[in-house]
Amino acid sequence: MQLSSSEPCVVILTEKEVEVSVNNHATFTLPKNYLAAFACNNNVIELSTLNHVLITHINRNIINDYLLFLNKNLTCVKPWSRLATPVIACHSRTPEVFRLAANHSKQQPSRPCEAELTRALLFTVLSNFLEQSRFIALLMYILRSSVRDSVCRIIQSDIQHYWNLRIVASSLCLSPSLLKKKLKNENTSYSQIVTECRMRYAVQMLLMDNKNITQVAQLCGYSSTSYFISVFKAFYGLTPLNYLAKQRQKVMW
């Protein structure tokens, strides 16, 4: 029976032994109480039965948030091979949590607290695979959609790092000139993406962590506070302090 989903990733839990085939490749067996994470996009996933399988559907936002939550340097992750079968399996440590996650992943949350509960449950499901060496590479493979998104994920993995075009291009197995060309085709540029990532992070730090401007500048990878302020003003139309005052005023109203 074919496993399908509208989301880019599904994770299954086997309640009995299940035979699996992906893209008509050789069949393999998942024992009872095993988890398997599949990349769904453009892949044909066949299971011997769906009667003894629980399924969670995981969207792009959850995967992206999970990678940020892990706070790993993604430049060190070897890209997933396009020839490899897009699945990773492991023994389930928390089957009861998975059952809750499977139920919640099929529902549309009506309240913010329900959305946060679903997010936490899915993070727990994904964390079962952390000991699998290629798991992060599979998640990055699942998220591939645009070069811009790939660059964003690398920069967001360590905002403070001194990024340059060569380092980012190398981590994507591209030459700097080819990366520039691909980004131009997506109507953006490397410098624009770096600025956007840093400015979004700057706002988070200002609003949530109660840090001063110099601290925020350093956390965003700027050695010069005055330069950080000028970039912030060009991006948001306000200085960091004025932006913060405006946001606090909104809360008061």
UniProtKB/Swiss-Prot annotation:
From the UniProt record, list the coiled-coil ranges: none
In terms of InterPro entries, this protein maps to: Homeodomain-like_sf, HTH_AraC, HTH_AraC-typ_CS, Tscrpt_reg_AraC-type_HTH
Q: Which Gene3D superfamilies match?
A: Homeodomain-like (1.10.10.60)
Q: Does the keyword Transcription apply?
A: yes
In Pfam terms, one family for this protein is: HTH_18
Listed GO CC annotations: membrane
Which biological process terms from the Gene Ontology are attached to this UniProt entry?
A: response to temperature stimulus
Ranges for domain HTH araC/xylS-type: 149-246
Classification via PROSITE patterns: HTH_ARAC_FAMILY_1, HTH_ARAC_FAMILY_2
Q: Any idea which residues the entry calls the DNA-binding region? A: 166-187, 213-236
SUPFAM superfamilies membership: Homeodomain-like
For this UniProt record, the keywords arranged alphabetically read as follows: Activator, DNA-binding, Transcription, Transcription regulation
Q: Name one GO molecular function term.
A: sequence-specific DNA binding
The protein's job, in short, is: Influences the temperature-dependent expression of several E.coli envelope proteins, most notably the porins OmpF and OmpC and the lambda receptor, LamB.
Give the PANTHER family listed for this entry. HTH-TYPE TRANSCRIPTIONAL REGULATOR GADX
Protein's name according to its UniProt entry: Porin thermoregulatory protein EnvY
